[in-house]
Amino acid sequence: MPNISSSELIAQFQTALREGWGFIYGASGEIWTQAQQNAASREQTKKYGQKWVGHRVADCSGLFAWVFRQLGGYCYHGSNTMFRRYSSASGSLSAGKRTDGEPLKPGTAVYKFNASEGYHHVGLYIGEGAVIEAKGTAYGVVTSKIGSGWTHWGELKGVDYAEKACK
């Protein structure tokens, strides 16, 4: 797998944010069609998916899968597996900071974990306390704060984190 710079990763996530991507569970960068919306079976998609017709859509890990494809790499579509098998280094967060005292590097994946669902959500830390995430069907791709419930971090395999870290 080619090394992808963290700045390239961040730039692709910023593109999804700027273009107003939507969230559809299971998606990874395709344009959501009316036919897909009409056939939707998930309640959240039936309720909120109409506003994403004609937009690119992804779920949280699907956004990573799409970005890696654009940059010539590969990232598994599934946040649990991303954390467990595709992190070259990982650990816990407390109030948005690494518990080992090291700085969180821009381009690092951040996760939400609970005992019943495991690592059930993933976003990308972009620096200065901000995360870009595909948040949910009602929200689409948005920014959030690193201190807003993110519990773990993982530096992804195939990403060059040599650029300056942010405290």
Regions found by a protein language model. Give the residues of each.
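N-terminal capping segments
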Residues: 1-74, 105, 118-121, 132-134, ...
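Charged, often glycine-rich, active-site loop that binds/positions anionic groups
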Residues: 88-98
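Short beta-strand segments that buttress and anchor functional surface loops
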Residues: 107-114
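Short, basic/aromatic beta-hairpin or loop at an interaction surface
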Residues: 66, 70-90, 124-127
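Low-complexity, Gly/Ser/Thr/Pro-rich intrinsically disordered linker/tail segments
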Residues: 148-167
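Short, well-ordered loop/turn sites that connect or cap secondary structure elements
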Residues: 98, 103-104
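Catalytic Cys-His active-site segments of thiol-dependent hydrolases/isopeptidases
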Residues: 76-78, 122-147
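Residues at the C-termini of beta-strands that transition into short coil/loop
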Residues: 114, 135, 157
